[in-house]
């Protein structure tokens, strides 16, 4: 049964009680006025009023009470009818209330200390504090940056935010996608100067990269499944998707082999090279179903020792396929893993130096350098990001009680070119609470839709901040114009009629106009950008001037002597520092012959 809100029922009607009491006094005045008819009483009404109001006590005469109640009901009914039929006017907002944001609008979201903010534009910033005193001003740190080629995505946004590395209140690690390899050259020195550990993964030249082994981050059966899912999602090519059967069959085989490698192989053999060797050794004879290749024998031996082993169960499902089918599956696997036949790539993934699970422990800057023209090896970068998100979320939950001590910002330039990150739409919705943020840099929003299909809108919806730096892609311009809304403007028209007599007319009216139309967005000034922050009016502001940043003087853009030398860094990276922690092993060589 619905409860009656007594307070809401009584309080609005209290004024009418006083009206009723006042009406009883007026009725009493008329009743006490001298005279026998109405006209005489009205002439002597003042005498009646003086007599009635001589005492402020309401009249309880039956006639007066009836008049008071009737008056209160009549006025209450009139107010009710008036309210129902009232016209709703919004002066100067008739066709829309859109406007540009001001300094007062952004003020609640900015930290007083410059270094504790994310740089959005020249005049707008967003605090790194994910739990501000006023909860209604809390915003996630996910940012969507859209700008055509040459709009300054790197210079006006990415580099300034990378230089926000001096905060002691909110320490931050960075994961930066560096398509041309010039961001680390420009900003690497400034980061090192502020205590950052630099790490580099390079898919352009494997010899000039630190080693990355996805197998090093497998700790459980679910990690194996995650790795296989990522591998398949990012090596499927651009053609029409094949039969789902073959993908599932490949998944079974990869899961079985990687499970065997993880649980049974020595640590130094837990890599893609071993996986390739396994597949190469899996000979299948269509005319001999009972033939056993070396891998079959290895799994038979493992089954005898551990019949319930995870890898054994997966391999048994794969072996249900007939000889011809199994051969087709192996061919498909060989084609998918063809890049790992390159010796340099096998060397790159032989062991791990990136230590992705430590980015939330101490200030680190991981630069992922990739080609902006060739995406052959971009699947490796996507695997890196997928494992990074999973590892950091698990560590935040299992070790740090839900929040990493060092916030990890992923600045993903050319986000559409690194390949698909599985479940990104779910990750961007959940990583905020773990002190992780994801910033996607695109040339057009259509790139995101092409890669993530229906999930693209979910990803954009979980970006509390979006910045448009300029561009001409029609879909992006149309969506932005609609999001900015309409403002109400004044229109002044003049008319002139000519005939026997000349007449003139003037007409003033209100009209609705888009805050910025599609054609206006297409010719947006190169120094301007549009910022949208959830719950705040949009801002039309200047792009951030990199030369105004306090750390600009330590970048290669300011002076070439501060250029970060990648080759020199990689050649000296194994030199130990006094505070480095290392594992020491003691070996007994007493039985060895003396050289």
Regions found by a protein language model. Give the residues of each.
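Short, surface-exposed polybasic-aromatic patches that bind anionic ligands, especially phosphate groups
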Residues: 545
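Compositionally biased amphipathic helical and low-complexity segments enriched in hydrophobic
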Residues: 7-10, 121, 442, 516, ...
